[in-house]
A protein has these predicted regions:
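Glycine-centered secondary-structure boundary/capping sites
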Residues: 40, 107, 117, 138, ...
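Membrane-targeting and insertion segments and their boundary/processing signals
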Residues: 27-34, 38, 144, 164, ...
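Solvent-exposed, flexible loop/coil residues
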Residues: 60, 72, 91-92, 108, ...
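Active-site phosphate/pyrophosphate-binding segments
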Residues: 1-114, 119-124, 197-207
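Short, conserved catalytic or adaptor-binding loops enriched in Gly and charged residues
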Residues: 77-81, 145-150
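Generic preference for well-ordered secondary structure
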Residues: 40, 44, 48, 84, ...
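Short alpha-helices
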Residues: 1-11, 149-193, 197
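Acidic, Ser/Thr-rich peripheral helices and adjacent loops at domain boundaries
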Residues: 122-146
C-alpha cells in the first residue's frame, strides 16, 4: 500500500534503533509502563479525532493485547509478580461523547488516555480542543457534586496532516512502543499460545 511505499515507518524504525534521547516510541513505552505499574491505570483509552483514524484504536487493541497479554518471564518461564499489558479500548472521539466521555469525566476509574488528532480535520480538531480543555480544567468550583467534572491526565498526539507518510510514522511508533514495553516486562510479544488453545479446542468441537 501507499503507506509502506513511503518513508514514514522507516524513519521511526531508524529512530528506535539508534537513539534514546529523541525516540517517541520509547518515551511513550516508558510512560505507559509507569501508568500501568506505578499509577495502577490498567486500561488504555485511545480516542481519535480524524475520521480517517476512526479504526486506529481497534488496530492498537489487537497489537498491544495480543503482544503484551502475557504472564510468564521469557527467560525463566516463571510467572511474573507484576502487571503486564493493559486492556486497550477506544473509538472515534465524536461518536464517544455520550459513552466514553461520561465515564472519563465523572467516573471513579482512571485510564491511560490518548487523543489522536489531525489539524487537517478542522471541526474534529476544534472538538478535540474543547474536550481536552475540559479535562485539564475540570469544574471544581461547581457547587453541585453531581455536576463536577474530574481533571484527568492524558496524552495528545497531534499530526500536522494525515498523509501516507504520517500514518506510517504513527503505526511504526505504536509497533515499536509495544516492543519496548515487552522488553521492560521481559515477555515474549511474538507468541499467542492462549489464542492457539482456543483454535485447538474449537477444531475439536467442529470435528
Amino acid at each position: 500500500s501507499d503507506v509502506y511505499k513511503r518513508q514514514g515507518g522507516k524513519t521511526i524504525d531508524e529512530l528506535s534503533n539508534k537513539t534514546v534521547t529523541n525516540n517517541p516510541a520509547l518515551s511513550l513505552a516508558i510512560q505507559d509502563v509507569v501508568m500501568n505499574n506505578l499509577l495502577n491505570m490498567d486500561t488504555t483509552l485511545i480516542l481519535s479525532y480524524d475520521y480517517k483514524l476512526r479504526n486506529f484504536s481497534a488496530y492498537a487493541q489487537q497489537l498491544e493485547m495480543e503482544s503484551l497479554g502475557k504472564s510468564v518471564d521469557r527467560d525463566t518461564g516463571e510467572l511474573l509478580a507484576y502487571q503486564t499489558g493493559s486492556i486497550v479500548w477506544g473509538g472515534y472521539g465524536p461518536r464517544s461523547q455520550h459513552s466514553f466521555f461520561q465515564h472519563l469525566f465523572q467516573g471513579t476509574k482512571d485510564a491511560n488516555t490518548y487523543f489522536l488528532v489531525s489539524k487537517t480535520d478542522h471541526l474534529n480538531y476544534k472538538q478535540f480542543k474543547g474536550q481536552t480543555k475540559s479535562l485539564i480544567s475540570g469544574n471544581e468550583a461547581e457547587p453541585d457534586s453531581h455536576k463536577k467534572v474530574n481533571k484527568r491526565k492524558f496524552t495528545s498526539i497531534l499530526l500536522e496532516d494525515l498523509s501516507a507518510e504520517t500514518l506510517g510514522q504513527l503505526i511504526a511508533i505504536w509497533e515499536n512502543k509495544t516492543i519496548f514495553m515487552s522488553m521492560f516486562w521481559n515477555i515474549n510479544p511474538f507468541d499467542q499460545w492462549g489464542v492457539e488453545l482456543g483454535k485447538i479446542n474449537t477444531k475439536k468441537e467442529i470435528e
